[in-house]
Amino acid sequence: MAGNDEFVVTPYEVKGRIDYERLREQFGTQPVTPELLAKVHHIAGGDLPPALARGIYYSHRDLPALLDGFANGKPFFLYSGRGPSGPLHTSHLLQFSLCQWFQKRLGVPMYIQITDDEKFWSSKSGLSRDETVQWGLENLTDILALGFDPKRTFTFFDSRSIAAMYPLAVRIARKIPYSTVKAVFGFEPSMNIGLVFYTALQTVPAFWPSWAEGRSIPCLIPCGIDQDPHFRVSRDIAEGMGFPKPALLHSQMVPGLLGDSVMSTTGDRADNALFLNDPPETVDRKVRNAFTGGRATVEEQRRLGANPEICSVWALWRTQFAETNAKFSEITEGCRSGRLLCGECKSQVLERIHRFYRSHAAARAQAAEWAESTILTSAPRPL
C-alpha cells in the first residue's frame, strides 16, 4: 500500500483501514439516511434491528424504489449467501439476521446461496471438495437456525443445485464479457476459469424467481460493501435480460477481536473472531483478551474515560449483543465517562454471548431436521 490512508476492498481481498464514506463515493452508492430508515420503519413496523439502527448498514442501491413498490403491492424477495470455508463466526450472522427480520416483518421469500464451488476454486488453504460441501451444510443449518420460515426459504447449494441454476447461468454468462470480469475483480492470468464463471452463478439467485415465474420480481441483497462489485455486474445486465436490477443494502466490515479494522476471514487468526462452534471456555478467553479502547490504568480510565470507537468489545455490543438502543447507549456512555471499566463491560457482554450460544444451539438442532429440504434441485424451465 502506498500510504497510511490506502485501503483495498474487493470481493476477494479487504485490507487497510477503510474510509467508508470515501469507499461509498468511489462505488457510487447512496447513503442510508434517517429518512430512509424512517421509511423502512413505516413499512415494516417494529424496532429496527441493531445493525440497521446503529449505522452498520450505511449504503444502498435503489432501496427506496423497492420499498415504495412493496408499499404499493409489488412483492420482492431477499437474497444473501455464504462461501463455506469453515465455521461461521458471529459477525457472519449480521446479513442473515437482517434478512430474517425483513422476512418476519414483511412475509417475503428468502433465497440463500451456499457457494461451495467458489470456495473450492478460491481457497488459499487448499480446501477439498468434501470439506466445502460439509461446511456448506453446517453453515446452512446455522443460518436457518436464526428463525427463517421453512415455507418461504429456499437454498441454492451450488454443487447440488446446478440443475436448477445452469439453464439461467448459461444465459447470464453469455451477457458478461471476460473483459468485464477481469476489470472488476482484477483477475490475474493465473486465475482458474472456475472463478471467471462464478460471477454468472452468483447472479442466478438475483434473477431466478423472475425467470421461474415469468414476471418481474425485485430483489433485495443485504451484503458487505466488499461484495458490491459482484452485483454491479449483475445490475449492468439485468434490464437487458428483462429482469429488474437487484437493490443492495451494504454493511461496513466488522472489526476483529484483536483490534484489526476488519474481521479476519474464516480460518485466519482464529482468536480474531467468535466462531459458533467455539466452546464456552474459548469464547471467554477470546473476549477477555480482546482489544479495547481502555486506558493504561484504572485511575486514568475513571478520570478520562475510554474510547469505544476503537474497541472490539464495544463493536460486539453495537452489532449484535445490545438488544435495545437504551442498553447500547448505557454501555457507550458508561465507557466514555469512565463509569464502566473494561473488565465489567466484558463480563456483561459475555453473559449475553453465552445466552445467545445456548439458544442458537437449540434452534440449530431443530433447523437440522429441515435444512436439506430447502435445497433447490430442479429448474422450472428446460435448458
Stretch-by-stretch model annotation:
Residues 46-119, 221-225:
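N-terminal catalytic cores of NTP/NDP-binding nucleotidyl/phosphoryl-transfer enzymes
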Residues 95, 196-199, 230, 283, ...:
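Catalytic-loop motifs flanking and including active-site residues across diverse enzymes
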Residues 1-82, 153, 235-288, 292-304, ...:
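Non-catalytic terminal extensions that flank enzyme cores
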Residues 107, 208-219, 321-330:
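Short helix-capping/linker segments at secondary-structure and domain boundaries
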Residues 129-247:
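Divalent-metal (Mg2+/Mn2+/Ca2+)-assisted nucleotide/phosphate chemistry catalytic cores
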Residues 122-126:
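Short acidic, glycine/proline-rich loop/turn micro-motifs
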Residues 109-117, 121, 154-158, 201-202:
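Core alpha/beta catalytic barrel or barrel-like domain that forms the active/cofactor pocket
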Residues 120, 159-165, 253-261:
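Short, conserved secondary-structure transition motifs
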